[in-house]
Structure formats: C-alpha cells, structure tokens
Amino acid sequence: LGTEFPLIQGGMANIATGEFAAAVSNAGALGLIGAGGMNADTLRENIRRCKALTDKPFGVNIMLMNPAAPEMAKVVVEEGVKVVTTGAGVPSQYVPAWKEAGIKVFPVVAATALVRRLAPLGVDGFIAEGTESGGHVGELTTMALVPQVKAMTDLPVIAAGGIASGRQLAAAFALGAC
C-alpha cells in the first residue's frame, strides 16, 4: 500500500476526519477517513483536506448501510482515492467500478462466510475484525478469526480489533495477518 509501516488506522466514524487520516499517513501508516457519519459532500471535503495535508497514501472507510453509500462509492472514484475499506454490508455492487479505477478494496469481515462471498469479486484482501473492535457484531475474537480467514484465501489478511501491544501484533502476524 506504499506505507512505511504495516499499520492501517481504523475508519472510525466521527473521529477519522481528513485531518486525522493525513496525520496518520504522515506518521507512516495508512490513514483512513471514516465516512460512516458523513454524506457524500462531506466525504469529498474530507478527501480534499487530506490531500492538502499529505502526499502519502490514505484511504476511505465506507459503511455500506449509510444511505449515502452509493454516492460515496462514486466520490472515491472521482477523487482518485487509492484504498477503500468497507463495513456494515457487502460491497458487491461497487467493487467492479472501484477495481476499474485502480482502487485497492479491503472489506471488513467478521466471519468466513463473507470471505467466500467476496473473494470471487476480485477484492485485494480482507480485514478480519474481531469482537474486540468497537461497534461491530461478529462472534469471534480477532485471534480466532484471523487464522480462519487466512485458511480460506491467499489474499492479504489484516487483523483488526484488540491489538494494543507488540505481543498482540506479533501474535497476529504469527496467525497469518500481514
């Protein structure tokens, strides 16, 4: 993804603004704009603010249950966003246009059933998000979910939720996360 460190900041709604994402990207990780509490115009403004503050890679997290998700799906293409993560839904209808635009697509998954459904669409990897992550409804912990997802795919698997120390990071890597 072109970052200095193998870290992706969570796409936290109402917290991860363009400024926040730019600061994370400037520090060497992949900053994400959390579009969950935004409309399409607000997302566009945040993308432009982020671009003004960094020349480093950044992305956008789109919560697919947001009524503005169809418009946001177009905004990320129009604004040249390079990475999109998705949550709260299945991005099937958006993946072809995103891939055509050269966007890397990483859906958040809380169960292996979603991996089976999304892998054939040509996504670039999966974010295996366990119960330790805020606001999500999966039934598995991150450390239980990551090896299950990795066993189903050769695509990159990113561990999310409850990783707050070097030991936890090392455990995620040992279980197959990248």
Label the predicted regions.
Residues 141-178:
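Catalytic alpha/beta core domains of metabolic enzymes, predominantly
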Residues 1-156:
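Active-site entrance/lid segments in N-terminal catalytic domains of soluble metabolic enzymes
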